[in-house]
């Protein structure tokens, strides 16, 4: 078999060679650092074997796949420690996540943070022993017998739900044996730093009809210094938590009367409307027409589009005049109906249709998280209908739009190309052509990208944009998707130069993504200190006493007349208190108005960062703020 490496080189091996041998043949140093490999898009551990021609990429801890292996093993070590300390525990599931790992546990003892140290100490003890992590393949009957004897009901249920011919794998660390597909580290010794983070409730299988389990979250690293750096970042992230700042800045709230459905307050609507109005203008300048399509559409539409098979478990349904309808989880079919409502010539293409469409998806209650994970959100979708010869140019334009959007907010970004998933729709040749087109577009733009095997949409491959925020976290936001399938499903056509009907190509594009989620990211990225153009209140006017209130009002009125968002704090409170409160609200500028200001007609300006400027002309102050707004300047 042939093993192909990322640099294009290749080597021949006998079938059945271990990942560790292939890695070691590259270099012994690399083997010492490696945690596994991505083989034909699948993550394998060092002890796993390769049986066929493969694309082979070694992964280390800094790679997301490496972290997945590392943290998965850490979750098993945590479970082993808990088995030692609380022998009656029943274990549910314990995966790695993007930010660490957790294990869902069923036991009488209710965990509190004071329990964490004993568990951490036991985990460190296990890790230090350099125990091998052994993969064991057994029959379904043996696995059921083992877990029934142990009283591990959740594992029994998981096995019984597997297909009859499913291969059962277990992993063993010391005296702890767990049902698991893996992959894992070779041994426990690489895990040098461990911290338990929190405890939460989680229904078994996410179903509120099932028992509430205890979910214990943790993190682990190769070095203590990495853990210390993580703790610092986590503390900063907690200060920036958009749920906390959303309340402090009076932007939005969540209520038990509508879990997962955000309520935006006036301040939040100013932020939202300024963001969307600006983006609307950008899209108009770039040749997009805006549409609005219904929230509720006939159920048959979702069968035709293919969304039914992929989204039905997360959709909301209703009946209208005895007909079956669904609340839309996606905007694409509505856009398609708009396109199909007219005849089109090749001269009309490309047609660019943008929509700020409200979609609904049923998320499990345990998955809801502020604005990041909601049940209703506005998606800044656009769909471009074009000739195949226009695809590359349209993708170029979309990439340029993405760059303009993200750089406006000071985000750095990386790009992933996500390829054909297992549940893809359509013909393989069309998929290969679509993937090739997106690759060529990225390469002609000289943009570095990584391949995310098997993570494309069911109807086409996609380019994903991952933003890096002010404290180094990454967020997947924008996406560009190439689709040959939905035009086929909906019989989309245009008339070519010969008068023949032809099929257009459809490009899906969302760059903000979920507007609510993007707002949450902005809140945390800026820590609530928004650029002036987005700030709900741009200037706070603070008279030092009632004596100067009239002059302060005249200044506030002049600023307001100039189009600035101004608040006059005329309360009978001490000036220092009012300044501190304005700082807590993260208002960009504070104007303290007293005798000197009234006499001179000049302003004393205090910036959000504490910098003070005296004797500022009112008109010059207004002009400088207008310039800051126009340039979308990022301060602080």
For the regions a language model picked out, list residue spans one by one.
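NTP/phosphate- and nucleic-acid-binding module
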Residues: 1-92, 97-636
């Amino acid at each position: 078999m042939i093993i192909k490496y990322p640099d294009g080189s290749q080597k021949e091996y006998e079938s059945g060679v271990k990942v560790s041998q292939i890695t070691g043949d590259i270099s012994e140093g690399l083997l010492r650092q490696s945690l596994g490999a991505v083989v034909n898009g699948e993550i394998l551990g060092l002890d796993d074997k390769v049986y066929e021609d493969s694309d082979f990429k070694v992964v280390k801890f800094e790679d997301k796949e490496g972290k997945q292996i590392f943290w998965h093993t850490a979750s098993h070590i945590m479970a082993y420690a808990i088995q030692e300390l609380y022998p009656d525990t029943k274990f549910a599931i314990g995966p790695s996540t993007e930010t660490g790992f957790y294990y869902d546990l069923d036991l009488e003892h209710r965990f509190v943070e004071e329990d964490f140290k004993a568990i951490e100490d036991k985990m460190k003890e296990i890790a230090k022993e350099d125990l091998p992590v052994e993969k064991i393949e057994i029959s379904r009957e043996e696995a059921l017998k083992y877990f029934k004897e142990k009283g591990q009901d959740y594992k029994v249920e998981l096995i019984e739900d597997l297909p009859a011919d499913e291969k059962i794998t277990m992993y063993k660390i010391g005296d702890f044996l767990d049902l698991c597909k893996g992959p894992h580290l070779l041994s426990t010794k690489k895990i040098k730093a461990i911290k338990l983070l929190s405890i939460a409730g989680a229904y078994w299988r996410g179903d509120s009809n099932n028992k509430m389990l205890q979910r214990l979250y943790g993190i682990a690293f190769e070095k203590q210094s990495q853990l210390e750096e993580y703790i610092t970042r986590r503390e900063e992230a907690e200060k920036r938590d958009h749920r906390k700042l959303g309340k402090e800045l009076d932007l939005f709230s969540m209520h038990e009367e509508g879990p997962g459905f955000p309520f935006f307050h006036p301040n939040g609507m100013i932020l939202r409307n300024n963001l969307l109005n600006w983006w609307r203008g950008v899209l108009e300048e770039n040749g997009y027409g805006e549409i609005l399509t219904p929230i509720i559409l006939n159920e048959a539409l979702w069968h035709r589009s293919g969304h039914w098979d992929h989204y039905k478990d997360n959709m909301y349904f209703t009946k209208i005049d005895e007909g079956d309808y669904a609340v839309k989880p996606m905007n694409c079919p509505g856009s398609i109906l708009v396109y199909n409502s007219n005849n089109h010539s090749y001269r009309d293409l490309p047609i660019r249709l943008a929509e700020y469409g409200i979609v609904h998806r049923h998320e499990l209650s345990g998955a809801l998280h502020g604005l990041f994970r909601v049940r209703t959100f506005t998606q800044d979708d656009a769909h471009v209908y074009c000739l195949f010869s226009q695809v590359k140019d349209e993708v170029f334009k979309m990439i340029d739009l993405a760059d303009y959007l993200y750089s406006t907010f000071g985000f750095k970004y990386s790009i992933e190309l996500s390829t054909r998933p297992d549940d893809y729709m359509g013909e393989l040749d069309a998929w290969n052509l679509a993937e090739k087109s997106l690759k060529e577009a990225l390469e002609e733009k000289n943009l570095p990208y990584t391949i995310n095997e098997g993570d494309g949409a069911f109807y086409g491959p996609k380019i994903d944009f991952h933003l890096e925020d002010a404290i180094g976290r990454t967020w997947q936001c924008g996406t560009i998707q190439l689709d040959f399938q939905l035009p086929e499903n909906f019989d989309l056509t245009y008339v070519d130069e010969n008068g023949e009907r032809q099929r257009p190509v459809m490009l899906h594009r969302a760059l903000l993504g979920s507007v609510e989620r993007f707002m949450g990211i902005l809140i945390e990225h800026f820590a609530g200190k928004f650029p002036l153009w987005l700030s709900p209140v741009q200037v706070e006017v603070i008279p030092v006493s009632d004596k100067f209130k009239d002059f302060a009002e005249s200044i506030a009125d002049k600023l307001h007349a100039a189009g600035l968002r101004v608040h006059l704090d005329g309360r009978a409170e001490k000036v220092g208190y009012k300044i501190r409160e304005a700082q807590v609200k993260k208002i960009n500028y504070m104007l303290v108005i007293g005798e000197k200001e009234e006499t001179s007609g000049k302003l004393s300006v205090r910036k959000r960062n504490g910098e003070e400027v005296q004797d500022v002309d009112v008109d010059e102050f207004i002009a400088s703020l207008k310039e800051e707004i126009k340039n979308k300047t990022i301060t602080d």
